[in-house]
Amino acid sequence: MKDKLVKAIAKDGQVRIIGAITTELVNEGVKLHNCAPTAAAALGRMLTAGALMGTTLKSEKDTLTLQIHGGGIAKGVVVTSYADGHVKGYIGNPTADIEPNSKGKLDVSGIIGKNGNLLVIRDMGLKEPYIGQVPIYTGEIGEDLAYYYTVSEQTPSAVGLGVLVDKDLSIKSAGGFIIQMMPGADEMLADLISYRLEEIPSITEMISKGMTIEEILEYIFEDMDLKILESIAPEYRCDCSREKVERALASIGQKDLKEIYDEGKEEELKCHFCNKAYVFSHDEVGDILENYYSEK
């Protein structure tokens, strides 16, 4: 089943919903970073969250970055997303893997840790990006984002994120949703939705059964006048280039760049988001020194 993201409303706009199936997207990210099972679940949840949240951006030039650092062996997860639904991300330690938790599930919280913060950074081309930050609530990512929305944006929200890792380490199913109550929404409605979310199967279970994202949302919001407003194809896509990596190399400063040049060797840099390697010869390092630091 192709990945798909939809935006919807229910109950005459009292509820705003973004839902997605992200199996292929997550599989691509997990393969690029060669993730162990628990690391795959952590990165996959963050990538799914990024895809969902990125579509709330107003301009295609805007970016949304999610960071979670909890002091655990995952060594943090970073995801950057865009308005068109494409995302990229990385986990500090792709080999992070521990025993399943007491429910027999991959222990994402156990590798993320709970001693740290979740950051949401919106760069809208202004002088300074908007940064929202909350302490990690559980380390399971979905609950942390729901806590962020409630505390930092004063929007009561439910966030469901799921990643099912197969025995061959490929992603069997992945997806998620963000459900938000709009100002003035009926409190009884919020209670009803909370009850339904407790009763439904996990999102990965529903995706594995072949349900589309529309069918999943119709199941949750039965008799609530669900209206699909927009459909987007999310994907994992890195926009790195030799020019960007060259600027990153130049940004380390003249002194460090001169040391690299004086060693007389080539310099290899890898993109954090896709692991693509960029090699700069000794002469090219010299050219960068000349172009960025010579006195004009």
Curated annotation (Swiss-Prot):
Keywords: Chaperone, Cytoplasm, Disulfide bond, Redox-active center, Zinc. It is found in: Cytoplasm. GO terms for cellular component: cytoplasm. Under oxidizing conditions two disulfide bonds are formed involving the reactive cysteines. Under reducing conditions zinc is bound to the reactive cysteines and the protein is inactive. Belongs to the HSP33 family. Redox regulated molecular chaperone. Protects both thermally unfolding and oxidatively damaged proteins from irreversible aggregation. Plays an important role in the bacterial defense system toward oxidative stress. This is 33 kDa chaperonin. The lineage of its organism: Bacteria, Bacillati, Bacillota, Clostridia, Eubacteriales. The gene is hslO.
